[in-house]
Amino acid sequence: VSSRRQRQMCIRDRKIIARAAKVDQVKAGEIHTIEVDRLMSNDGTTHLTIDMYHNQLKHPKIADKDKLVFIMDHNVPAENPKTAAAHRKMRNFAKEHEIKLYEGKGVCHQIMVENHVCPGEFIMGADSHTCTYGALGAFGTGIGCTDFLYAMVTGQSWVLVPDTIRFNLHGKLREGVYARDLMLSIIGMVGANGCNYKIMEFAGEGAHNLDIDERLVLCNLAVEAGAKTGIVEPDEKVVEYVESRGRKAENLFKSDDDAVFEKVYDINLDEIKPVVARPHQIDDVVDAKEVADVKIDEAFLGSCNNGRIEELRVAAEILKGKKVSDSVRFLIAPASNEVYIQALDEGLIDIFMESGAMVMNCNCSVCWGSCQGVIGKDEVLISTGTRNFKGRAGHPDSYVYLGSAATVTASAIAGKITTAD
């Protein structure tokens, strides 16, 4: 790792901010008013925003309904009358203001990537993992209800320009090692606060060797290192992905060759091993073999970090012809309906069901720890979810380990934490 004083306005994320702020350049530490390209809110907090809209602002005009996206994914379908009321409020508001609403279609960030995100856009979402969109070369960042409400009625928001930490990725991941292992390893290296209010930029030939699903994994977990967002330099793979979905791949910003970053890390991908984050800190990352033989009660494959078709293929390959341990509940939640249908077409769902796994509907599911698959006192879960703090997936006296889709699946078969090799 090298540490240097950062030179201004050569770095990709600042070019995105400058575009949104309608200025020629921006500098780290400056505060700018920006035009938001897109706003996303899910059922976790949208009802609170709607209450503020009615009670505090007295029904102002929405700036641009076409920039707004509402997605129900955290508690879908509703698990109690309170959630049902919040969902009804969300539906009614979306209908009244002609806002695009997705219900039961998948996890919010997957829906956004499939249908809305374009390179170079400045996107805000009322969810901390909005940083996912950096995989397509966008600037995605999470905000709270108050900031969301302001942006909804004005079309604008503000940003304190961050410094940037660059992660140069070299080579390719070895067989049996995945982007999930890479990002958990990075978080273990820098710490959960190691990139506080920084941009995590992933670059180098190693980054370009990753497919879109793998890049989504990296950027999605950037916030778990404290980052403002994560971003991968857009390339031909991004252009192909975006244009194949009928969107334009414009504003393909790249950092200048002579850009200087606050820090630069060089990571050899062929040195990454299967890892696990132990309870109750995501940066307590160890070689998966160090926690081998830890008995588990539940395994989960899904969330906005995993649950895409690539992860489901990995799981199906491991599960084919095998059975989930009688002592384990293995829950699988495809990230979206599109992913679910593709998994059906490829025969993956058949493999899951025949193995004894339970295939859930497309939502946040176990990761959210609110409506499906919650774990009880003293129970142990291994998960592809995003967090493992106390009580994240159920009882505060339960234990959550985080691993890759391969490690989670192999563990579900063995009844204890193990790797797929």
Residue positions per predicted region:
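Single conserved hydrophobic/aromatic residue that forms the stacking wall/gate
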Residues: V1-R7, I11
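Short coil/turn connectors at secondary-structure junctions
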Residues: A21, V26-I31, I62-L68, E96-I99, ...
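Long, structured ligand/cofactor-binding scaffold of large enzymes
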Residues: L39-D147
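Structured alpha-helical segments in the cores of large, soluble enzyme domains
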Residues: M52-K61, M90, A94, T146-W158, ...
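Short internal beta-strands
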Residues: D66-N75, N168-H170, E201-A203, V232-P234, ...
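Accessory "access/gating" subregions that flank catalytic or transport cores
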Residues: P81, F93, H109-N115, G120-E121, ...
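Phosphate/diphosphate-binding loops
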Residues: I349-S370, T386-N388, A405, K416-T419
